Amino acid sequence: MGYRAAGKSTTGNSILGREEFDLKTPAQCVRRHGEVADRHITIIEAPGWWRSYTVEKSPELLKQEIVLSVSLCPPGPHAVLLIIRVDDRFKESHRKALQGHLDLLGERVWSHTIVLFTHGDSLLDTSIEQHIESEVQDLQWLLDKCGNRYHVLNNKNRSDDTQIKELLEKIEETVAQNNGCHFQIDRKILQEIKERRRAEEERAEERIKRMKKQSENIRSQMSDTQHFSELRIVLMGYKEAGKSSSGNSILGRDEFDLKTSAQCLRRHGEVADRHVTVIEAPGWWSDFTVEESPELLKEEILLSVSLCPPGPHAVLLIIRVDIGFKENERKALQGHLDLLSERVWNHTIVLFTCGDSLLDTSIEQQIESEGQDLEWLLDKCGNRYHVLNNKNRSDNTQIKELLMKIEETVAQNNGFHFQIDRKILQEMKERKRAEEQRAEERMKRMKKQRENIRSQMSDAQRLSELRIVLMGYRTAGKSSTGNSILGREEFDLKASAQCVRRHGEVADRHITVIEAPGWWMNEPVEESPELLKQEIVLSVSLCPPGPHAVLLIIRVDIGFKETERKALQGHLDLLGERVWSHTIVLFTHGDSLLDTSIEQHIESEGEDLQWLLDKCGNRYHVLNNQNRIDDTQIKELLEKIEETVTQNNGCHFEIDRKILQETDGRKKMKEQIDKWREDIRSLTSE
């Protein structure tokens, strides 16, 4: 058992001493046998999950296979080997994913589980115990959960059979710890899965027959003249769904860059005797509603269908087949597609990517197992769907079949392509022109403002020390920003409940960075815990005499509306009105902008973001935390902090002592109450 690429197949081969397991990722359980060290060994390899994806994000078929795996070696396995790579850091997200998937088997499975570390050769002279102690608490939690049973395997060194003999001994010890018993799953859980699987397979067969008949009926109504010499296609879907790869597969060459684009891309090519135009629209976050997406993204989705005039023959809605599709994804997808009007669904085909992960499983089995949200989507699209394996470009039959399905879609629409309401398109184009004009003006204003400030600054005003507080909602990118500023991994990416202080030398300055804990993005200050509010107030006192700037962190790839603005305003107001004069808005995820200027994003996003920038004296900066080697973005940020100090007559921010004393007093009182409660508990227990 384990995540993808952990080394399950290689481990199975090492145990059996020969190549029995295919190194391709299986979609179903694989069973193999062999004689090892005078024992008959049966090994079941369960399919793996994506390492950082919670169990809720995994497809239903995968979850069923995990449950079924322990029934394939009756009466049950003597041990479950939980495979983890020793050369990869084990993070909280990995622990949560692993825990969720193993919990499908019930709580008792942990008593029969051994953690098996692969890539043991990477340890060199380091012992596995040293590695475990050097890792954070998540790995230690896992080992505690498994009764501290673990083993290291070097799959590259097959000749060393002592490591396999020792592993088999540890499995026997595990059985002894369980009073000689193997693991047995609750029969009720297993029976339910088997019954559900049978029903799904029946429905999948019926679906295959229905789809075949539907296609035959459409083809019989089409004449030879309805074979198109030109096809216009729009690719739509969430980020990382595989839009660019699909575009490249359709055109048969690398035309689309696999980087996420902020704007629509248009490419052409000759495919199967047709001139094909493909438009790739930028994607949204898979479980973010349309209200949470930036306005620029929504504008691009609307524009996409106008870039292949007179309109696309089909919209291909891209979904990964190796990731679960639930209500959140369905709502996000529905909201974004509805921007194009209700009529777009008549021209839409669902295109499943990562088809290679299905192997011997039919797409119909996947659909029937996944549940009502995916079925709703297919019904909405007139049950038009196709599976693509973007890794197998040489198989051009999958593309020919897709183009035929697009022609069938046109036939279902009486020979018509999709055309967006001209009024909607015209209004959007006019709005975009006005935004671009305002963006140009803003850029000039900001440039002039900075030049004026710099002209007032003398060389003596270049500060040798800078004190910075990072403030913002959870997942905004505060820790990553702190690491980018200091040029190294100083802040843990886990959410912290308390302020964290770090120091470093950057661009000939001594920098102190305080990271304050974040609030929930849409939650007003009244709903935040008192401890969080206290930490926000205390943050500015942790770099005495006070910070030169407060960096207010906001993600540029997420919409900023009234709820976010109110939450942010409420939390920052805890520090008093004067804090706004020392605040700079720092946009993270700058890489998602690409060729779009930050000014265009600001002008398109609307009044709430503009209110915030006005409140901060129009001080802002964009950071791409993925590009650490570009130190110009950090140097420019430090210059903007110095300019902020100049705007404040050389003064740093200092919180009203009364606010600080009140907060400090409340914190001390809470600590005293907690101590009293602890004392009472200890006396009661005695």
Residue spans for each PLM region:
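C-terminal non-catalytic interaction/localization modules
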Residues: 1-43, 48-61, 72-76, 89-114, ...
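Glycine-rich, N-terminal phosphate-binding loop of Rossmann-like dinucleotide-binding domains
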Residues: 84-85, 319-320, 554-555
